[in-house]
Amino acid sequence: MNVTLSSDQYNALNELEYWYRKGSHQFIDVSGPIYTGLWDVLQVFLEYAGLDPREVMYLSYDQRTVLDLAYNRYHGYYIYGKLYKYDRNVDLDSIPVINPHSTHLSYTWTKRIRQKIDKRYRLIVVLDASLLNERMLWDLSKYGLPVVLLRDPYLLPDADSYIYTREPNVFLEEPTERMARNPVHTLAYSVLHDKRLTVGSFQSANVIRRKDLHMYNLKSSSMNLVYTQEMRNIINDAYRNTMKRNPIYTYANERVYVADSHYQEILVNTIEKKVKIYLQKGMTGTLTKVNRHAAITRYVPCEFQPDYYHEPFTELVLDRDYLLRRETKSRQLIPDDVVKFEYAYALTPQLARMNHWNDVTIIMEQVQEFDEKLAKLMSYTAITRAARSVTVVI
C-alpha cells in the first residue's frame, strides 16, 4: 500500500506488528480520532503481516460501513448479526387460542453467540470499538482469533462501554498530512482543540450564523443533527409543515428512524448472499409505502427502505401512536410484530452514532446540562457523521 505514514502511525504500526508476531494478548486496542489515519495504519499492517483481505473479518455497528466494505471486496459484517443468533420466546399465556382474554401475542428475544465462524479468518477487526461492552469482548474472545479494536476516543460511548475500564494499548493524536487536507476532519480537529469556529466556506466544510439558516439548508442535507430532543421535535414538526403534511396522518416518502430492533427482519443481497441488512435500532430511511388510514388508526401496514440500500423491508406494521407522540384508545387487534418509528428530519448525536451520511447540517446549541467535555464529544460525534460535507450553524 503506497501511503506515507506519520511518526504517530509508524509507532502504531510497530506496536501492531510486535503484538501480532510476539504478543501474548488476544486483543490490541488502538485509539485515535478520525484525522489520525487508523485505517491506513491497519492496511499497512495487514500487508506486512502477509494477511490476505479474505482472511480478515471486519465488524461494525454502522450498516452503511458494512456495505461500503462489501462493495470494496472486504469481508464486512454487522456485528450483532455476525456474532449472535436470536430466538423468539413466546409467552404461551398470550396466545389467543390458549387464552381467550389475551389481546396480543407477547414474546421476548434471547440471543446466543454463534459457535463457529469461517475457518478462513485469521484476524478480527472491530471498527467502532468504543461502542463495545465487556460482555461482547468476552464473546469475541471465544473464537480464539487475534482481535484489533479500533477505538475513536471522542465518539460518544455507550454507558456500559468497555473504554471506561480499559486504557488503549496504542494512542494516535497527530493529524496525518492527507487527513489534514480533508475539511471535515479539520473541523473535527478544531472542535477538539478549542479553536474558535470562523464563519465561512472551507470547501466541503461550511460555518454559518443562525440568522442565515434557511429551510433550504435543512432540505439539502442528508441528515440534520441537533443537541437536544426538544430542538429535534421542533425541526421534525417544521419540516413536515413545509411539506404540507397534515400532522394527524402518516405519508409515504417520510424520513424515519427505527426505534427498536426486529431481529427476524433481514434483507439478503441477491448478488452476494453474505451481505445482509438488519432492521435494527438506529437505522434511518424512508417509508416507501404507507396504507391509507383514518386519523385515529394506530397500526398501519408499511414498507421501509434504509438510506443506503436499494430494497425496502416489506410487510411491516408501524405504530402511529408512537410515531406521532400521542396516546389513543385503539380498538384494533394488536399485530404480532409492530415497528416503532420516529421522524428523522433531525437526530441527536446519540441517535446518530451508528450511522453516517454524505451531507450533514449541525445546529449547535448551548445546553446548560452539558459540561465542556460532553459538549466536545457531542460536536465531534456530529461532525464525524458527515462522509462528504458538513454545514455547522453557530
Task: State the predicted function of each range.
Residues 58-60, 125-127, 146-152, 392-393:
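Structural recognition of the conserved hydrophobic beta-strand(s) that form the central parallel beta-sheet
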Residues 13-15, 53-138:
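Conserved P-loop NTPase motor core of helicases/translocases
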Residues 53-54, 121, 144-145, 166-171, ...:
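Short glycine-/polar-rich loops that comprise or flank the Walker A/P-loop
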Residues 24-26, 53-55, 95, 120-122, ...:
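Short coil/turn segments at beta-strand junctions that form active-site/ligand-binding loops
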Residues 36-40, 45, 59-60, 67, ...:
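Core RecA-like ATPase module of SF1/SF2 helicases and allied nucleic-acid translocases
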Residues 128-132, 153-154, 352, 367:
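Conserved Walker B
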Residues 28-31, 119-126, 200, 336, ...:
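Short, basic, glycine/proline-bearing loop/turn elements
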Residues 3-42, 49, 138-139, 143-145, ...:
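Conserved helicase motor core of P-loop NTPases
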